[in-house]
Regions:
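Short, polar loop motifs at secondary-structure junctions
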Residues: 78-82
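Glycine-rich, Arg-bearing micro-motifs that act as flexible, cationic patches
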Residues: 60
């Protein structure tokens, strides 16, 4: 998981009332590997804005997609809109 997405997960938990440190520890429980957001990911994520903005995707969403592209890994999401993307990625819906 990208450090950007880990931060997003922590933020969502804090918004629901978790103390920040507890939210961080809870978010970590779902991570097998944490990958720092770097310039390669930033370049890909930034270049996706025209395609992803009409679907309402966030920087965190684009960071996730960029990391998957670089790793040639599938992306798991609950957001059905991602299936409309025309990137060379395997997008798997969780529900």
């Amino acid at each position: 998981v990208s450090t950007v997405n880990l931060s997003e997960a922590q933020s969502k938990l804090v918004r629901t009332g978790f103390p920040p440190d507890d939210a961080w520890e809870s978010a970590l429980t779902f991570c097998n590997e944490i990958i720092s957001f770097d310039s390669s990911q930033a370049r890909l994520a930034g270049g996706m804005i025209a395609t992803t903005q009409p679907l309402g995707l966030s920087l965190g969403d684009r960071a996730c997609l960029a990391l998957a592209m670089l790793l040639k890994a599938p992306v798991y999401t609950t957001d059905r809109l991602w299936k409309k993307l025309s990137f060379d990625l395997e997008i798997r819906l969780l529900r």
